[in-house]
Amino acid sequence: MEAARVRAANASEVVCAAWASELVRGAAWLEDVGAKWVRPHRFWPEQERALGSCAAWYPGIYRQMAPCCAGVRLEFETDASELVLEIALDAEPAATSRVLAGVAEKGLLAPGAHDALAVDVDGKRLADVPLDAVEPPAEHGPRGSEVAFELAAGAASGDLLQLPGFADASRVCVWLPALRGARLGRVRGNGTFLRPVERDATVRRLLVLGDSVAQGFVCDSPAASWPAIVARERGLDLVNQSVGGQVFQPSALVGLDRLDAPDVVIVALGANYSYGRASVAVVSREVTEYLSRVDALWPDASLLVMVPPAGGKTSVPGSCYPFIGKIIGDAVARVRVRRVSEGRVAVYEVVQPELGEELLSDADGHPTAEGARILADFVDARLDELLECTCLRDFGQFGRCGACLGTAATPEDAIAGERGDDPADSIEDEE
């Protein structure tokens, strides 16, 4: 049988089951929509109001993007060989449709939703179900569809039928769509148990504050975005508060003090300043205030700030984008001075790699799955430096300790998939 398939919701026999409300990870809160179904929200209500307010650059877009389930997932353990997820998808947001129209115009990728439900088993990708296949016909009713996943392939057992309850226990992660919202019912299986994964206090928490690239445009699967890849491969507990079209909006952080404190915060904003006119002075104040608020919220979290690449992107007349690298750098420097003076972990600023045209799905710089993989590898290497480097804490500057010198790689190295010369050769001696 196929690893994943779709069928209409029905009253088929339940062997083991759990409500999605018990299994959701990566959401700020859950909205009860009746009959024990829930809608996961990535943002607290105060944040949602701020995203749709006059303080936002593109409130109409943000109101559409906030309900999307980027980074939200169901995590559980089961001995079932087949699972069924009850899900009702939201309609595709108009803002998403406009981006996908640009993808179709470029022609590198085939037309479609470019989003999916994705399943990991024991930390490895199992299957994706494109949303084009999940969206139910009207006659299926308000409860939407059932998506069935097989966890035990017949070929692995000599094409013999796997009896219910005889499969090995597995840890399963179901990634919800990145580019639209959803309502969730039960997860059912044919095994003897299906239970939530116990929270492990030793697992580091990762919070990503980014734009459409970090949200998951347009890499075809929610499990293929760079935040999802980094979280899966490093075993991090991810909350992804990335929003298509977002910039440094300080008011969007209001209410985040209720979130469980992250161990690592990645800020990946700035590229969208290329689309609008803005004063350098105003944007400088907003970027400084934003990063200062992040620092105040989580003073002990490792902070990675990703600056958009300097080249390869045109901007409208009057845009501050040509200066955004310096604007972000100056704001990071203020946070760094404060952290170093207090003996806390320092902030790390890096420039994102510039992807080639063959790695971009459209003219707006959204990566393909291959491009997202390169970004994930780049971020992963930077986290090695950030989490292992002591010179950032002691000196506020990268390049002093063996940990960072041993793992440093340039953006060009990341794109080429190989290391260049010894990075120590390019670091100036400041003794």
Language-model regions: role of each:
Residues M1-R205, R382-E431:
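N-terminal secretory targeting modules
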Residues I61-R63, S242-Q246:
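Short, flexible loop segments at the rims of nucleotide/cofactor-binding pockets, characterized by
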Residues V174-G244, L253-A261, C391:
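Serine-esterase "nucleophile elbow" of acetyl-processing enzymes
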